Amino acid sequence: MFSLRPTALVSLSVVLFSIQETLSEQQPFVSPGWSDQWWHKSELESYTFPWPIQKVAIIGAGPSGLAAYHELDKAGYDVYLFERDTVPGGNWHYTDETPVKEPIPNADVSIGDFVPSLPPEGVRLPYEEHYEGNVSDELLRAHRGPKPIWNSLQTNAPPPLQQFRDHPWPADQPWLLPHAVLGKYIRAFASFNGINSNDVENPHISYNTRVELVEKCFTSTENGPMRTGWTLTLKQVSRTGTNTSKAVWTKENFDAVVVATGRFNAPYIPNILGLKAWADRFPDRIVHSRQFRRPQLYTNQTVLVVGAAASGVEIATDIAPNARAVYLSIRPRRISNSNSAGNPLSSRWMGRLPHNVSVVPEIKRFLPPTSAIALSSVELTNGTILTGIESIIFATGFRYTFPFLPQFHNTSLTNHDLEHKPKPIVTDGTHLRNLFLDILSIEEPTLGFMCMNIEIQNFKYAEYIAVALSKIWGNKATIPPVTRLWELNERRVMEKGGYGKYFQFLGFRGEREMIRLFTGWLNDAAASHGGRQVR
């Protein structure tokens, strides 16, 4: 998703390939492991929603959440947008403030992003609490969740690949954009739709508001409780003075919910032998890459960067001019002749690393810490012992997590365990399960998800998902009945070789095939039921 200045060199061929793929003539549609045009069959046998869908909650005001709001609002839904941060933008809202430091070892994935904060049991809502001093500051920071981008970060794709279709960039934009420019573009799109944080006249937007819990909603009837949607528990935190703040909890009911919280919320740090002892002994010297902001912090230090995906390579490159030396620890399989964006350390790129960046093997263990981190030792898988390390940055990625959906987490399951009801969406955090097209819960098709795939152009892909959700929930596009959805899901798992880290991976070709699927399905639906077509 992210990239620094060197990407202008190392990803040019990848981006050119993407543009070529986008502009090329459409090939005959090939289903990417889902089915043989299931939508033709679903006209006679389709899922029926148990209640009409009109009022929709969107969780998250990043690019995908804004795209969802734009489409659903245009389609006539009663849409509400909730964002924990102060402004829209998602991961493209940069601040010097860093997130709350992650625990080592990792927290359980179900609370990997945050621990839900619920009002005391039995209190009447709305319920308020007031805070002051350091408690207030830390509450605000934890509540809004500063994003994992750094000061010098630039986009890894040109503007035409990172834009909303109805709001193209001017033609004279540079090839790569500073994060601040893209952030302004996203906020401008929000303003155009009347959903920026300063659009105070819009009662349907709530910034500084975190969704703490999403649970089933029931209505009392003569025949007993009847399921009618979802109840959201909301917590809005606002500053009331220089060092004071207040939190207000409320609840609200919705017919459907869109999860647009992204994939970069719960940091992952591998559980390497001896690491916990180092983290306990040197807590300020071992961080996840989401804490990184400026390279000057590492001036004249010897730094160990762990991870060879985009963030690891580019953080190592960014700090190299300031650092004494940088070690980049990678798994051997990460060096290849591939030009894939999934292999940032291809052999063609190795020579472009700064002279003081040394690529080293994977870490085997951290030897028992001594009185100072620089006097302590790290053993690599090839037997090499590193000493003199003064800081460690784990650029080892993130895990899927939705703390507000505890009923859809089951971290006790492995990739090979059989599932039991309720079927989880999140297990170990490396992938998502039991979603149709990765956009709808199979058990609860009024629960939608935006842009949860890996290696996609989020702006473009989000618009197809938003149209799909709009048409499905408005009965202008059909999906198969739940039994058929489970059959398709089982086929997909089998074709993918089981669950795992790359279960949601699409890449350029996979994204192109999915867009063809959306186009064929949704345009067939438009011909049958009316509504706009997609292209």
From Swiss-Prot:
Its EC number is 1.8.-.-. It comes from the Eukaryota. Pfam families: FMO-like, NAD_binding_8. Glycans are attached at N134, N243, N300, N356, N382, N410. Its cofactor is FAD. Keywords: FAD, Flavoprotein, Glycoprotein, Monooxygenase, NADP, Oxidoreductase, Signal. NADP(+) binds at G307, A308, A309, A310, S311, G312. One of its GO terms (molecular function) is N,N-dimethylaniline monooxygenase activity. The keyword NADP applies. Pathway: Secondary metabolite biosynthesis. Transmembrane segments: none annotated. The keyword Transcription regulation does not apply. It is an enzyme of class 1 (oxidoreductase). Gene3D superfamilies: FAD/NAD(P)-binding domain (3.50.50.60). Induction: Expression is highly induced during artificial growth in symbiosis with Populus, which is close to its natural condition. FAD binds at G60, A61, G62, P63, S64, G65. PANTHER family: DIMETHYLANILINE MONOOXYGENASE. Flavin-containing monooxygenase; part of the gene cluster that mediates the biosynthesis of the psychoactive metabolites ibotenic acid and muscimol. The first committed step is glutamate hydroxylation by the 2-oxoglutarate-dependent dioxygenase iboH, and the last step is decarboxylation of ibotenic acid to muscimol by the decarboxylase iboD. The order of the intermediate reactions is somewhat ambiguous. IboA likely activates the carboxylic acid at position 5 to introduce an amide bond, and the flavin monooxygenase iboF generates the N-O bond. There are several options for the latter step. Belongs to the FMO family. This is Flavin-containing monooxygenase iboF. It comes from Amanita muscaria (strain Koide BX008). The gene is iboF.
